[in-house]
């Protein structure tokens, strides 16, 4: 009943564009004083499964380091770990997610005490996952019934527990870094938190 018919718009055609170009996902190391490139590594090359917002790109997350290793998160394209000289140590594909309104995947990874935290809140396919920072092996993963959020989590030690505090749709939640148990949550945010 509501399907478009060509005769309704004889001079126009409509469609949805999907990325069809191979993108190169690059990690750069620059000299802080001069801006000179020290090294450049291609993490992966692929055609993204979805587009990105015009003001954004597929490299939205900030790289994270523990002083020994560099962690680069390109969302559905993968998570890549390098030593500080550019040698790839490991990589993980954490799966593709459908992104809200083509805004991309922009939550940066956080590292604490040998654990790497990745939050992915997109279109109710949402998760929070903790990996071993040295090996990339999973420690725990929790599904989250969330819409879209793009806020990087915060690690806080309180009441004898190390907590991962992160936004959610309409609320803030705290998870136990050791095992992923929900410690507390409170309302007060809107959806699509950044």
For the regions a protein language model found, what residue spans apply to each?
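Noncatalytic, solvent-exposed loop/strand surfaces
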Residues: 1-194
